[in-house]
Amino acid sequence: MAVDIGKLVSEAKSVISIDALSGKTIAIDAFNTIYQFLSIIRQPDGTPLTDKDNRITSHLSGLLYRTSRLIENGTKPIFVFDGIPPTAKRKTLEARMSRRRAAHEAWEKSKSEGLLEEARMHAMASTSINEYVIGSSKELLRLMGVPFIQAPGEGEAQAAQLSRAGLADASASQDYDSFLFGAEIVIRNLTLTGRRKLPRKNVYVDVSIERIELKELLGKLGITLNQLIWLGMLVGTDFNQGVSKVGPKTALKIASSCKSLDEVVSLVREKYGYDFETDPIEIEHIFTNPDVEEIGAARFSEICSSFSVDKEGLVSFMCDKHGFMEDRVSKIADMLSSAGASRKQKGINSWL
């Protein structure tokens, strides 16, 4: 589960246009973004896009069209892929797998009964990322000339490291966990803008790009980063379930009143009879000392400059292999080549 602090973050959000990100380097949480593409780019009954060999292509569609739109607008994306998850995340991953299996069964049942809206909702909940999705996503990004980094651990943590090092202007993720890892600025809805229909309601909402700054968030909440981490632990993170009956507002009161993690642990044990199922010190350590590569400016430039557009390869991969329309892909390939040539003229540090 991603940490549920959305209600507390609302006052620190600002809505921005895509133009505001022109010239900015954005470290994108790859798994989070790809998951969104797989989830929403589906047919009315929830069936994902596939090619002639029945390989899923929803993620490729999202990566190609939405990433190219960012680049055309002058944004400089770099995707960060998850590595090996912390041991403490195992229970969360197992629970997710169980929920997705149940959702898949519900999807098949709803489809057979002709309940398209329910089928689509269950299909979205059944979304998962496998090795094919990861591999094909990396191959597409490579052919597009879009840099990506393989993080040793959590992708959000590595993206936050790039932010703190001044190598990325912001992290992009739908999850607020990025703040717990110390991301200084988080962009939400970067690739999800537009009108969205609310589940089971004939209501559409406009989804806009949001910008949230950690410093402003902490200031509005009146807490430190450590206290924000404790707050997250109280409502639940990917590494612990959280305290029953303690919502974000109560968690804020508890975290802001405590000066140490020991004090937080003692308070919730006495008041709520709650003991963390995972060592709370271990959870805190995951956020304060995550498993990341300490990337500096030279290494970052080396990574980014190693990627270049392969026009023929891109058309072959997307059109010959996966059945996308050649005229659209060719136009995107030309645009990416022009953008790449412009960056090359500016030198390898143009990503900084």
Give the location of each predicted region.
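Noncatalytic, basic helical substrate-engagement surface that gates or grips nucleic-acid strands
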Residues: 3-12, 16, 20-164, 184-186, ...
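Non-catalytic nucleic-acid-binding/docking modules located in mid-to-C-terminal regions
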Residues: 12, 16-25, 202-352
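Intrinsically disordered, low-complexity regions enriched in proline, serine, glycine
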Residues: 37, 89-90, 182, 190, ...
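Nuclease catalytic cores that cleave nucleic-acid phosphodiester bonds
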Residues: 47, 126-277
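A short, structural micro-pattern
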Residues: 73, 172, 279-281
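Intrinsically disordered, low-complexity linkers and terminal tails enriched in Pro/Gly
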Residues: 109, 115, 198-202, 345
